[in-house]
Amino acid sequence: MLKYTWPLLIFGIVGILNQVLDKILFPFLYPGADMREQLGIYGACVKIAMIMAMITQAFRYAYEPFVFAGGKGEKSKESQALVMKYFVMFTLLAFMVVVCYMDVFRYIIRRDYWEGLRAVPIVMMAEILMGVYFNLSFWYKLTAKTYWGAIMSAIGCGVLVLVNVLLVPKIGYMACAWGGLAGYGTCVLLSYFIGQRHYRVPYPVPAILGWFALALALYFLRATPPDTLSTFHFPLFTFDCLWLRLAYNTLLFAVFAAALLWSERALVRRVMGKLLHRLPKNK
């Protein structure tokens, strides 16, 4: 029992470190005199990205008992693959809501902190990858090889620290966002390739990568205010008119939502049929 659980303890501790370590390291790495101000900007903007963290956390509590109840059969593997696809689709839909309507969400924080909004999409994408990593993590739990979880999480944490050490002196709090993305991305890659050797699950990788590609393409096409710094400091479309920005970004969101509905039209048709069947009929 101890052999199974102690790596999970390390896994949990490292997971907490991945969430807070960048903020702990920042004061020691940032060379500017405005360190507290910069850290405050980053911390405030991360609050918006916590929308994604709440989604992934709720998913974790609901999904883990379902997987362990299903065991290690082929049907369970197919269910895990299907859930992974829908998890990515739903979280990317939430990502599109936030980035397309940042003009609305930015009022959650003070106007003085708006310059840090360019970190929000990166932090949100890191949270999505954290959820993907959680989905991938069941292979070592079901095969009683939990030490892999501790090893991979430690490597991911090391990548986060390395990115922060190298980039915080150069690009400030943006390095914290990129460090989280790099750390979780490393964990995802390690868990997928190692896991497929020990516990093969037929994840629809091309479809998942396609949804990421579509979401990122629409993200780069979104409209921003003229005075807003984008993630890469060169927004493609800047409109002065708020309503024009919202209308244009709504169109981009509609493209993504329509693509989701079209790809899952058979499922949507079945769900709508069941809902309509439950409606009271006029006599």
Where are the language model's segments positioned?
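Membrane-proximal transmembrane or re-entrant/amphipathic helices at the cytosolic face
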Residues: A223-K283
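Hydrophobic alpha-helical transmembrane segments in multi-pass integral membrane proteins
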Residues: F11-N18, M96, V161-V165, A215-S230
